[in-house]
Swiss-Prot record:
Condensation as annotated region, ranges: 823-1150
Family: Belongs to the NRP synthetase family.
Keyword Nucleotidyltransferase: no
GO molecular function: 2,3-dihydroxybenzoate-serine ligase activity; phosphopantetheine binding
Name of the protein described by the UniProt record: AMB antimetabolite synthetase AmbB
Classification via InterPro entries: AA_adenyl_dom (IPR010071), ACP-like_sf (IPR036736), AMP-bd_C (IPR025110), AMP-bd_C_sf (IPR045851), AMP-binding_CS (IPR020845), AMP-dep_synth/lig_dom (IPR000873), CAT-like_dom_sf (IPR023213), Condensatn (IPR001242)
Annotated GO CC locations: cytoplasm; cytosol; enterobactin synthetase complex
Originating organism: Pseudomonas aeruginosa (strain ATCC 15692 / DSM 22644 / CIP 104116 / JCM 14847 / LMG 12228 / 1C / PRS 101 / PAO1)
Region described as Adenylation: spans on this chain: 245-633
Pfam families hit by this protein: AMP-binding, AMP-binding_C, Condensation, PP-binding
Keyword set includes Ligase: yes
Gene, per the UniProt record: ambB
Length: 1249
């Protein structure tokens, strides 16, 4: 596994790289087989940074060298040392002849580490490995040195020189002397490694000793580890959880305790109502250790309910009302709940399970008159049971005692100041332990809770600016930042529940209101948080920020597979102990004993986390991943084994597993793999899973195989499992009919799943863009053209599309492009002309930022040169001649590529900011220079690099960035790029041929007749400001609420149009009401890439085509929407018709032109290829000031829904007006869908004014 502080691990996939250039002999193929997959890297203690191959060697002779062990003994000890450092497989290079066991060692030796074998077995296996390598490798002399020199670890015959290869070397001299050398400036580190080696060499003398248990730490190391396992501060006191709230209520009775959707409650009111409920619960039999289910909606009653159960002496078991009935029933049975606390919204559902219920709203008046007697509950009684995903297929309840929760809250009160508690957002489900911090931590410290449904309710939350502290998972925080929804009052950010990445820290640094960023780690089994790390927002952000040091009263240890301590810097499993440990898993003694271990030395309990960590010299822990099948997905802890167990229980499935995958577009999703003789029906499979698993554990894709691939030891080989994109969500045998087969494959390519009988394209997750690509694929493969109108007026089922394919006659050949220079396409010419009219205008400069992690600067520069050579659009200047503007390609090296070295991340950011400022103000001289400039900023001693791409719009567009980023990643990962299917010149030539044929003019004339009334009506668009400088722009990115997004999709499905059509219709209606017009001219932004061969091109192909939207109130919503859907599909089908053709046709009819001042567009997310097994490349455009049109709305598809990006000319649409338009647009969408409109979105507010 590649780690940040080690030499990046590499391996040869074929062995050809090692044997390349050698004469082809019969033995070469044999050598390649031996070398296939051989790892050439090295894992060493984390504080050693093996980065500089020119660093001087440090030299040390181990103490045991005086004992004159033979070379084979030292070699075995060295291999054991590397194995215990985490190198399960290692390749040693022998660049010089060395004698081992009386024979010359081979040039390379592949070896593996087996912790359970004895010293004698290790010695015998080493002899076998040496013999095997000698048989399969024949290199000698220069060939030997070339082969061995590729390895990070060397075995030398003499002390290394400056030119010696490798990073770590064991020296076995002919006179029997032994030494270690390391390319690292830290002499003490080498001394420590040598000490480990010496002690292991002595231990190997015992032939029966287990190599994984050989002692290797000295007394100083053991004392140091003991000192770092806990903090010196005294542990917080154990007590009763709700006593903290009761004491606070007595101190500040009138202070507001919670703002919720239904009402606000003071501390006195919350105390009184929870006490009344506690009286009722005690009367129902609740006492210490009695479990009470809590199934309540998320309003003020939730807090009353939780506190009521605690104050009655009971233990609350939270139940999410959205959980499947089977899961709720299992949790109630497993916890043996006495009763369930419900409200009016959940009563019927719980009662249907046959459980005794107590309704929150009933009986409160009588209980208010009764005093709450003192409870017998103590620190050792249960406070709550939270169910987590279980590897056995069933969730398991983590039982937390009052004393553990009390101690945790005491720490929280000391760690955070009073002003930080003044406004805490409570957005986490009570079924997850982060809620314990949010709810009870705030109430213990006299703060005010802001209780919302979830974090994505923030945009509509009226008190959002009162929130001072946010406690959430990194993925949700990243989404909030992307949406621009981080409240302005937030001063403290707690991030927990998932690994925190450096790129998110850098984004948070750009939020001026955030003054404190805290990275917290901890499993539910250790009461929410176990370690804490404060991040310096003014210092360089590491790519993997650490999880910090333990909380007071908590112990941390990094242990190996034998539960023995590991040296500082060596990766192992994290064990937790101390005051926060849970009692165990409720009712599951065997699982409790498996995870909650007893230290044989001290007798203390400690919890096996399953997390792989290492401890730095200062005691700070770094999180490296998981050791088991547990994953964190969107903040939820998920045991993949539970999903696999549920999959395997489906009839016909013999074996199953689940994985969290990440595709090339950066989308993370759960995928289920099934071994079955046939593909089970997708709907039936989803229904089966939905009966047991909560929504966040449901796979979004499935792969069905005849059998799951296995490793040599019989385990499922997860690396060999195919990606879901390749196999699909519900694999089926392809139809035998060629037309049906082509439709099946094209549908699956666009939607990631094969077609299902009767399911419409939009209902299956499609949109207009995917529809275009689907038909383009079919047209290319079958030479049959199905009109896009097939997606209007009906659900566009597979059956309907197949029938249209059968009816479509094969197309004839397209008009051949004429000979001669094609010149510029009309889209390119349009932007070139704009540059000529305003040579100093920089509004068409596009700036993109690409962040690259895991590649060297030389490799990045080489890949960039390849891309510049590949994509001629980035290096074409434009000359003006008798035939008009003509492009002329420059050499790739003529495109400026500047490389700067930054001393640290702060310096890098400053260089980038300077670059953005400089490039944003610098014009392109398209007549004499390439339309692109590149700035590569490399950070010293870091795996990161930043690329600033400055390019004129004439040569680039949105899709181009996605292509550029994806191809850059492919090259940096060592892949090859296929031959481009077209060029910008060929696109322009085809356009010229189509114009000559008259086809484009005929379409344009038809549109012109329809648009003529609007083209002559100047009032159909906002009036432009008279003053100059009206191009100054405002940009506002606002999330579309989940309710609106769902309503829009439902409306689109009901009317058989795309969701974008529904959004566009509402956009036009809101603007029409704003402007007082019955019809509106809207420009629709289109990619202009209707042909498949254009998909992989870098260039400018965008088109802006006019759409007339009727807004007459006498027409029904559905009629208007179907009309927009029909017209939009016509635009998409003919998106190659240039805007100039439409404008010319209008002028021929007496119109002065086409006043497009308002536009709307959509695309499927940003270009952000994510890390899979290689280099990570993240790309995005940098927003530039200014607005080219009066108002534009872009809808960006994101995992959580839509992001609406509004841009307007400042003098017409200020930020306040844009925000009102957005709210009115959402209201209109809900109204059109016939959905209930909330009080905040009343029908009276549909007009934005």
């Amino acid at each position: 596994m590649q780690e940040r502080h080690g030499l990046p691990l590499r391996s040869f996939s074929s062995g050809k790289a090692l044997t390349a250039g050698r004469a082809v002999r019969p033995e070469v193929a044999q050598e390649r087989r031996y070398l296939q997959g051989a790892p050439l890297g090295l894992e060493l203690p984390g504080r050693i940074a093996l980065r500089d191959p020119h660093c001087a060697w440090q030299w040390f002779e181990p103490e045991a060298a005086a004992e004159a062990f033979p070379a084979a003994h030292w070699l075995a000890a060295f291999l054991v040392l590397l194995g215990r450092y985490g190198n399960e497989e290692i390749t040693l290079g022998f660049p010089e002849p060395i004698t081992v066991r009386g024979r010359q060692a081979p040039a390379l030796l592949r070896s593996s580490y087996r912790a359970m074998e004895s010293s004698a077995e290790r010695s015998a296996r080493l002899a076998e490995e040496l013999d095997d390598a000698r048989r399969q490798l024949s290199a000698d002399g220069q060939e030997r040195a070339a082969l061995a020199g590729r390895c990070a670890v060397q075995v030398l015959a003499a002390r290394p020189t400056a030119s010696s290869p490798g990073w770590l070397a064991l020296v076995l001299a002919a006179d029997g002397s032994v030494g270690l050398a390391l390319r690292d400036p830290q002499y003490d580190e080498l001394r420590r490694i040598a000490g480990h080696l010496a002690r292991l060499a002595r231990g190997l003398v015992d032939a029966q000793a287990c190599v994984g248990r050989l002692p290797w730490l000295d007394a100083d190391e053991e004392r140091r580890l003991q000192a770092l396992r806990s903090e010196p501060q005294a542990a917080p006191s154990r007590g009763v959880l709700h006593h903290l709230f009761e004491a606070q209520a007595r101190r500040t009775p009138q202070r507001i305790a919670v703002h919720a959707a239904d009402r606000s409650l003071s501390y006195a009111e919350l105390e009184r109502e929870s006490a009344a409920l506690a009286v009722r619960l005690r009367a129902a039999g609740v006492a210490p250790e009695q479990r009470v289910g809590v199934c309540l909606r998320r309003d003020s009653g939730l807090l009353v309910g939780l506190l009521g159960v605690l104050r009655a002496g009971g233990c609350y078991v939270p139940l999410d009302p959205a959980y499947p009935e089977e899961r709720v029933a299992y949790m109630l049975d497993d916890a043996d709940c006495l009763l369930v606390l419900v409200d009016a919204s959940t009563r019927e559902r719980v009662a249907a399970l046959g459980r005794p219920c107590l309704t929150l709203e009933e009986g409160g008046d009588q209980a208010n008159d009764l005093a709450l007697p003192a409870s017998e509950v103590g620190a050792d009684h249960l406070a709550y049971i939270i169910y987590t995903s279980g590897s056995t297929g069933r969730p398991k309840g983590v039982a937390i005692e009052h004393g553990s929760a009390h101690a945790f809250l005491r720490w929280a009160g000391q760690h955070y100041a009073a002003e930080e508690w003044s406004g805490v957002l409570a957005a986490t489900s009570v079924c997850f332990d982060l809620s314990v911090y949010e709810l009870f931590g705030t109430l213990a410290e006299g703060g005010t809770l802001h209780l919302v449904e979830n974090l994505f309710s923030l945009p509509d939350y009226p008190r959002r600016d009162e929130i001072s502290l946010l406690n959430t998972v990194p993925s949700v925080c990243a989404a909030l930042l992307a949406l621009g929804d981080l409240p302005g009052g937030v001063r403290t950010l707690n991030l927990a529940g998932e690994p925190l990445r450096g790129h998110l820290v850098r984004q948070i640094r750009g939020q001026p209101q955030v003054r404190r960023l805290v990275n917290l780690y901890g499993p539910t089994e250790d009461t929410t948080y176990s370690t804490v790390h404060e991040l310096d927002l003014h210092a360089e952000a590491l790519d993997e920020p650490p999880i910090g040091r333990p909380l007071p009263g908590t112990t941390v240890e990094v242990l190996d597979g034998f539960e023995a301590p590991l040296p500082l810097g060596v990766a192992g499993e994290l064990y937790l102990g101390g005051i926060g440990l849970a009692r165990g898993y409720f009712g599951k003694p065997e699982q409790t004993a498996e995870r909650f271990r007893v230290d044989p030395g001290s007798g203390e309990r400690r919890y096996r986390t399953g997390d792989r960590v290492r401890m730095r010299e200062d005691g700070v822990l770094e999180h490296l991943g998981r050791l088991d099948d547990q994953v964190k997905f969107n903040g939820f802890r998920i045991e993949l084994g539970e999903i696999a167990s549920c999959l395997a229980s489906f009839p016909g499935v013999s074996e199953a597993c689940a994985m969290l995958t990440e595709d090339s577009a950066g989308l993370r999703r759960l995928v289920g793999y099934l071994a079955a003789p046939f593909a089970p029906p997708l709907q039936a499979l989803n229904e089966h899973l939905g009966q047991s698993l909560p929504h966040y554990m449901l796979p979004s894709a499935f792969v069905v195989l005849a059998e799951l691939p296995k490793t040599l030891n019989g385990k499922i080989d997860r690396k060999a499992l195919p990606r879901p994109q390749a196999t699909g969500a519900e694999p089926q045998a392809l139809p035998s009919d060629p037309l049906e087969q082509a439709l099946h494959q094209a549908w699956q390519a666009q939607l990631g799943a094969p077609p299902r009988a009767g399911q419409g394209f939009y209902a299956a997750g499609g949109d207009s863009l995917r529809a275009v690509h689907l038909l383009a694929t079919l047209r290319q493969r079958l030479s049959r053209r199905v009109p896009l109108q097939a997606f209007a007026g009906g659900p566009a089922t597979p059956e309907a599309l197949l029938e249209l394919l059968r009816q479509a006659a094969p197309e004839g050949d397209e008009p051949e492009p004429s000979a001669g220079a094609a010149g510029l396409s009309l889209a390119e010419r349009r932007l070139w002309v704009a540059q000529q009219l305003a040579p100093e205008d920089t509004s068409y400069n596009l700036l993109a930022h690409l962040r690259i992690v895991g590649a060297t600067a030389d490799a990045i520069e080489q890949a960039l040169r390849q891309l510049l050579e590949r994509h001629v659009a980035l290096r074409r200047r434009v000359e003006t001649g008798v035939d008009g503007p003509q492009p002329h390609a420059l050499a790739a090296h003529a495109v400026p590529l500047q490389r700067l070295l930054a001393s640290d991340a702060v310096h890098a950011e400053r260089l980038l900011e300077d670059g953005v400022r400089r490039e944003g103000a610098r014009v392109f001289d398209l007549a004499h220079e390439a339309p692109a400039r590149l700035l590569l900023v490399v950070t010293r001693d870091s795996a990161r690099a930043d690329l600033l791409l400055s390019v004129h719009h004439y040569a680039f567009d949105d899709v181009s960035l996605a292509v550029f980023a994806a191809e850059l990643k492919t090259l940096l990962d060592g892949g090859r790029l296929g031959v481009l299917a077209s060029t910008p010149e060929q696109v322009a030539a085809r356009e010229r041929a189509a114009l000559a044929s008259g086809r484009l003019d005929r379409v344009a004339e038809r549109w012109a007749e329809r648009l003529l009334p609007l083209a002559k009506a100047p009032g159909a668009a906002p009036a432009r400001p008279e003053e100059s400088g009206g191009r100054a722009g405002q940009r506002l990115a606002l999330p579309v609420s989940a309710a609106v997004h769902a309503a829009c999709r439902a409306l689109a499905e009901r009317t058989s149009v795309s969701p974008f059509s529904a959004a566009l219709q509402a956009f036009a209606e809101v603007l029409g009401a704003e402007l007082g017009v019955d019809d509106l001219l809207v420009g629709v932004a289109l990619a202009g890439r209707s042909r498949l061969e254009m998909q992989g091109l870098v260039g400018c192909f965008v088109n802006l085509l006019p759409l007339a939207v009727g807004l007459r109130p006498e027409q029904s919503v559905e009629w208007r929407l179907r009309q927009v859907g029909h017209d939009l599909l016509e635009l998409l089908e003919h998106q190659d018709v240039p805007l100039e053709c439409v404008t010319q046709a209008l002028r021929q009819r007496g119109a002065s032109g086409l006043p497009i001042r308002i536009a709307c567009g959509a695309h499927n997310g940003r270009a952000a290829p994510a890390v899979d097994a290689g280099v990570r490349v993240e790309a995005d455009f940098i927003p530039v000031p200014g607005a080219r049109l009066d108002l534009t709305l872009w809808l960006e598809d994101q995992p959580q829904g839509w992001l609406a990006v509004w841009t307007g000319v400042s003098a017409i649409f200020d930020l306040h007006r844009i925000e009102r338009l957005h709210q009115a647009w959402e209201r209109r969408l809900l109204a059109n869908a016939g959905e209930p409109i909330s009080k905040r979105m009343s029908p009276e507010g549909c007009n934005a004014s």
